[in-house]
Each structure stands twice: as C-alpha cells, then as structure tokens.
A protein has these predicted regions:
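Flexible phosphate-sensing "switch/lid" loops adjacent to ATP/NTP-binding sites
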Residues: 1-173, 189-351, 355-358, 365-367, ...
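The conserved Walker
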Residues: 177-178
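Transmembrane alpha-helical segments and their cytosolic interface motifs
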Residues: 182, 360-362
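Hydrophobic positions on the alpha1 helix immediately C-terminal to the Walker A/P-loop
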Residues: 185
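Short clusters of small/polar residues that mark proteolytic maturation junctions
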Residues: 374-375
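A short, polar/charged loop-to-alpha-helix boundary motif
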Residues: 378-394
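Short HxH-centered metal-ligating active-site micro-motif
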Residues: 392-424
C-alpha cells in the first residue's frame, strides 16, 4: 500500500497542539470529541497510513492529563436506539466504551445523561452504572435551546444542570453517536466552571472536513460522501475569512451554529476566545499529508464505494432517501468519477459475461493486477476469487488445487444434508477453514495462507450482492468491497443477509 499520511508525525503534532490549547485556558479544557475514536476506518481508507486507532493512540500520549466523560441522551435510552456498526443499543455501547477506555489505561470519570427526563429505563441505566462504581450526572432539556441564549446561559438554563465533577486538565467529551449532546455538555460545564472561578476552555476535535486543504479536495468530498445521509455540506468558513483573510473549510452545521455558540461564550466568559468555527478546532491531520496524490486517489475510490453502498442499501432495505443518492451522484460528478471506470469492476463483469452471466468477483492487488473468480460447482465466485488471489500473491500457478475436491465435498454434504442449507458452494470463511486444514500437510496451501495479510486494502467487486458471511469475512480481512445492487436470484422476494 502506498503511504500518503505520516501517522507518527500526526500523533506527536496532534497531542502537542492539544497541550498548547489546554495552556491557553486556566489549565482546564473541555474537548468535544467527534467521530470514531477506536476504529476510524474511514480515515484510514482516505488517508493511507492513518491507523484506525490513531486518535486513541494520540489520547494515550495525554492519558496522565485526560479523563473521559461519556454522554448519552435520555431519549436514546428510552427508544433503545441502535448503533448501526455494532448492532447494540446506545446504553450498552456506553458500557462497551467504558470497558474499552479502561482497558487501554484511560480514566473514565463519569457518564452524563443529557435531555434528562424521568423514565424507568433511564433510572435503571443510572442505577446499573452506579452499582458498577461509575458516577452519573444529569443535564436537562432547556426551553428555547439553542437560540434563546440569555435563558440558556442562566441559572434557569445551564444552571439547572448537574456540575460534572472532574479531576484532570483535559476532559474528553465523547458519546455513542451523534445527537447525544456533546457540545451542550461542554458549554454547560464552562458555565459552571466560570461560576467557580475557573476560566476553562472549549475546543472541538474532528478529523473531517480537513480545514487546511481545498474545499473540493477528494478527501473532503469523501467526508461529504460518508455523511450523505445527514446531508452535511462542506463550506468555506466565512467567519475565518472575515477575521483573518484566510480561506479554510468547515461544515455547514458548525458554521450555522457559530453565532449562537459565540454569544454563549460572551455571556459565560465576558468575551469569546474564538473568531470562527475553524478557531475552535484542534485538528492537525492536514499537516501530516505527505503524498497528496495518494490521498486524492484513495479518496476517489472511497467516494465510489460510498455510492455503491448507497445503491446496495436501497436494494436491500428500500429505506434510503433519494436525496442521499442524488448527493452521492453529485459528489461522483464533482470528483470526475463514473461507475464502471475501475478495472476491478470491468474485470468482474467481463468474467461474468464469459460464464453466461453467472456471478463473478474481481480483486485488485496492490500492484494493480486484477484477479477474478467465477461461480463453480464447489466454490462461490467470491471464495474462488479469494483463493485465486492468494495463489497469485504466493506465485502458485492458477491451475493448482490448494484444496482438493475430496476435501470440499464432505463440507458440502454437511451444509446441505445436515445443516439445512440449499447452496452447496463454499463461502469465503468456509474455504479459508478448508485451506487452513490443507496447510497442515500441503506446503503450497500453507504458502497461500500466509499471503492473507497482503489482501488488506485490496479493492473487491462482485457482480451480485453478497451474503452477510462473505461481506463480514472481507471486512475482517481489511478488503474494500463493492457490489452491484443485484441479487443472484432477482425473482425471489426474501433474501437472507
């Protein structure tokens, strides 16, 4: 994989910049932490070299100064809101986050329930945390929020909220997902800190959009693609341009809310420390891009992946809004991209046509070589492509059988005769297990198996929608999958995922 981002430079520069921001205030900074902290795979895809846990590693450099406060909305507890990427409710995700933070040595100070209203589910959640030794605090709905600034910044507004007791200079405010009330929690704390004579500060940490690269840079367009369902729009920050004469990039929601936030700062502290939403940020990612073209190309590919994902979700669920698809089509046009222009798509379709329209899969290796797989009597197309790619990486002739038919057929019998399956062909996870068994006595199979790490970052395209098993295996291997929004059996009404 070509590297476009210096991760070591980022860790050092980002942690130092946050230290500097702490010092600008009364040695107390509330840092609103947006995006994914443990597993930012989007950033790792568009900034090759950025590690998925880079933000966590950066925080670990500040762990002696930092404590974590997790916020969750009472509304999300009552509604049992689900975090899509993990398939668990927000309240359970709070417990997962606590374990994850504590597991790496970060101090979790407390949990704050925002938009608090008395409800059995909320009280049970608080009791569960308290029984586990985790302190909880309550923040309430404020009439007129966010526009009635005078009421919000008063004893009847922020003053009604619990003051979250914290111990360390850096307080990281994070949440299971968006809309949890991170910014409001930070500003409420500033109100209470100033009441106590502590001139604390606020800053915002988000990786995207990157403020100091062009508005239409593919990295920033890829962020818009990732948030197409939210209809976030990257914009030139007009406040920064007016204050400094410098063009920077921010996104619409931060720009729209800035006058309100600025007015709150003035009421809390007497004057605002910031002249623009860009000023509020602490993101240093743009300074760590070391090969712009590598990041541009990676981001173009990400935009295409997001477009295919949207089409597939619409096919599977029928719940995708047309506005999301239109937004992604617009971004494709802005980036000069077209469906079918990638070699991996072209080769997959060519292989399908050559086999009478049967499903086919193609994998593009890191050197640009494209390997295909067809649907056969023993393997599905995606499993076939996987084995063929491993052969190519290991320098093994394609005609070599790494797993014998005699080894595969009993597995097919198990699937169809005993486990109630209808498709006898092996999925990717099944062929990998079979390959692992063969590797014990077959040196070529062992050589192929050892190439699995080299599939990380490879693009894969399937001419049909894949099962959840095949999709999950590709994800665990770190491969970047796209599919045509077509079922293998289009006439069926129900399709198992």
């Amino acid at each position: 994989m070509k590297i476009g981002f210096d991760n070591d430079k980022y860790l050092a520069m980002q942690s130092e910049h946050i230290r500097e921001r702490i010092q600008k205030f009364d040695n107390k900074l509330y840092l609103e932490f947006g995006g994914k902290l443990f597993d930012d795979y989007h950033a790792s895809r568009v900034l090759p070299g950025f590690q998925p846990d880079s933000k966590l590693q950066m925080l670990l450099q500040l762990k002696d100064q930092a404590e974590i406060v997790i916020v969750i909305s009472a509304e999300d507890i009552v509604s049992s809101k689900i975090r899509g990427d993990y398939g668990i409710t927000y309240d359970l995700d709070v417990l997962r986050l606590i374990d994850a933070f504590q597991g790496v040595g970060l101090y979790v100070g407390s949990v704050c329930v925002t938009k608090y209203t008395a409800a059995p589910e909320v009280e049970a959640f608080e009791k569960r945390l308290n029984d586990l030794g985790i302190r909880t605090f309550r923040h309430y709905k404020i009439a007129g929020y966010p526009n009635d600034v005078a009421h919000i910044v008063s004893d009847e507004g922020y003053g009604r909220n619990d003051y979250i007791e914290t111990e360390r200079p850096l307080v990281v405010i994070t949440a299971p997902g968006p809309g949890s009330g991170k910014m409001a929690t930070c500003l409420s704390q500033l109100y209470h800190e100033y009441k106590r004579g502590v001139k604390a500060g606020y800053a915002k940490f988000e990786t995207f959009p990157i403020w100091n690269i062009p508005l239409k840079h593919p990295v920033n367009l890829a962020y818009e693609a990732a948030t197409a369902d939210l209809n976030d729009v990257n914009m030139i920050d007009p406040f920064h341009l007016e204050a400094y004469g410098v063009t920077t990039v921010n996104y619409n929601r931060d720009i729209e809310i800035f006058p309100v936030v600025n007015a709150m700062f003035e009421l809390i502290a007497g004057k605002s420390p910031y002249k623009s939403p860009t000023d509020m940020g602490v993101n240093m990612a743009g300074n760590c891009i070391v090969d712009d073209e590598v990041c541009r190309e990676a981001s173009r590919k990400e935009i295409v992946r997001r477009y295919f994902k949207c089409l597939c979700q619409q096919k599977i669920t029928g719940t995708v809004h047309e506005s999301e698809r239109y937004k992604l089509e617009l971004l494709m046009n802005q980036a000069g991209l077209n469906v079918g222009s990638r070699a991996v798509e072209q080769q997959a379709h060519a292989r399908s046509e050559a086999t009478g329209g049967a499903p086919a899969t193609a994998i593009e290796l890191s050197d640009g070589t494209v390997i295909t797989g067809k649907t056969g009597p023993l393997l599905g197309a995606t499993a076939s492509a996987l084995i063929n790619a491993l052969k190519a990486l290991a320098g093994i002739p394609q005609e070599t059988d790494l797993v014998s038919a005699a080894a595969i057929e009993p597995i097919q019998t198990l699937k169809t005769n005993y486990l109630g399956g209808k498709n006898p062909r092996l999925h990717t996870d099944e062929i990998l297990i079979a390959l692992s068994s063969s590797a014990a006595t077959n040196e070529l199979a062992a050589a192929a198996l050892h190439q699995l790490p080299n599939l990380k970052g490879c693009d894969v395209h399937s001419t049909v929608l894949l099962s959840g098993v095949d999709t999950g295996t590709r994800n665990r291997l770190g491969m970047y999958l796209t599919c045509d929004p077509v079922y293998e059996e289009e006439d069926r009404k129900y399709h198992k995922q």
